[in-house]
From Swiss-Prot:
Protein's name according to its UniProt entry: C-5 sterol desaturase
Species this chain originates from: Mycobacterium bovis (strain ATCC BAA-935 / AF2122/97)
Subcellular locations according to the entry: Cell membrane
Major localisation: membrane
Residue pairs linked by disulfide bridges in the UniProt entry: none
Biological process according to GO: membrane lipid metabolic process; sterol biosynthetic process
Gene Ontology MF term list: glyceryl-ether monooxygenase activity; iron ion binding
Gene Ontology CC terms: plasma membrane
Domain Fatty acid hydroxylase positions: 94-227
Membrane topology (UniProt): Multi-pass membrane protein
InterPro entries: Fatty_acid_hydroxylase, Sterol_desaturase/TMEM195
The keyword Membrane is assigned to this record: yes
Keywords, ordered alphabetically: Cell membrane, Lipid biosynthesis, Lipid metabolism, Membrane, Oxidoreductase, Steroid biosynthesis, Steroid metabolism, Sterol biosynthesis, Sterol metabolism, Transmembrane, Transmembrane helix
Length: 300
């Protein structure tokens, strides 16, 4: 079975071109309330968009490789460990697959924002200061975490190909929520589904928006598990530490490099583990006495 994402690519490109064309008059820089320059709403920056599209093209190949690797494990789990095998011809099997993938995506996505090693695979998607359809294509190249997260699905008896198909459908749905061109939708839809308004919050680096709205298709997971945040104002997009590069290799690997640097700088095993498995931005709680004394002197 061919990946549904491949069939969706022409639609992705068409929507991207239409949005980019509409944004040509909006590429001037506006001044935010903080006095700092920021991209205008709905704007595109050519170098930023080229980087996003390039990462998306590479991710097609890397994702195919990860799926091929996962297929071996999923097939073995489905054939030898699953207590039963669900029929792909039953409608409820598709419901289980799509909802199951979405719930596990929420779980993985939340972990990816709270565990630095996994954040390193995901941060590239958040590295753009623009929020548009090109940003949707700024995908990671390391899907190992998702593959491990979805192991329960073939163990439940879902055919491996159906798991992959549901994964692709989840990804396709998420494309259209990466836009500032769509305001809020009807209340019932906003209550149940992930929407552009919800996902703008997720990409915001403002303190009130950090680590919120992890849902892929359904936003009800965020409402149930306490991570929902409504859109109160236009977010500032990007990472809390600005990334001054459009090099796609550096965008994908920068956090891994930072982890290695912090690991080497730490002198205690506890601190090293914190730098790897703690949340992004984690720092040791204890301060060297000499540094503390120096801080005390300078504070005077």
């Amino acid at each position: 079975m061919r990946d549904p994402v491949l069939f969706a690519i022409p639609c992705f490109l068409l929507l991207l071109i239409l949005e980019w064309t509409a944004a040509r008059k909006l590429e001037s820089i506006e001044t935010a309330a903080t006095g700092q320059p920021r991209p205008a709403s709905g704007a595109y920056l050519t170098r930023d968009s080229v980087a996003s599209i390039s990462m998306g093209l590479v991710s097609i190949a890397t994702t195919a490789g990860w799926k091929s690797l996962a297929l071996l494990g999923y097939a073995a789990i489905y054939a030898y460990l699953a207590p039963w095998q669900l029929s792909a011809h039953r409608w409820y099997t598709w419901v289980i697959a799509i909802v199951g993938v979405d719930l596990l995506y929420y779980s993985y996505h939340r972990i990816a924002h709270r565990v630095r090693l996994i954040w390193a695979t995901h941060q590239a998607h958040h590295s753009s200061e623009y929020f548009n359809f090109a940003t949707a294509l700024r995908q990671k190249w390391n899907n190992s975490g998702e593959i491990l997260m979805w192991v329960p699905l073939p163990l439940m008896g879902l055919p491996p190909w159906m798991v992959f198909c549901s994964w692709s459908l989840n990804l396709i749905y998420q494309f259209w929520v990466h836009t500032e061109r769509i305001d809020r939708l009807p209340r019932w839809f906003e209550f149940v589904f992930n929407t552009p308004s919800h996902h703008r919050v997720h990409h915001g680096m403002d303190p009130v928006y950090l680590d919120k709205n992890y849902g892929g298709i359904l936003i009800i997971w965020d409402r149930l598990f306490g991570s929902f945040q409504p859109e109160l104002f236009r977010p500032h997009y990007g990472l809390t530490k600005r990334v001054d590069t459009f090099n796609i290799w550096k965008l994908q690997t920068r956090e891994y490099v930072a982890i290695v640097r912090d690991w080497r700088s730490a002198t205690r095993l506890r601190d090293r583990l914190g730098y790897v498995f703690g949340p992004p931005g984690w720092e040791p709680r204890t301060i060297d006495k000499s540094n503390a004394a120096a801080s005390l002197v300078t504070s005077r």
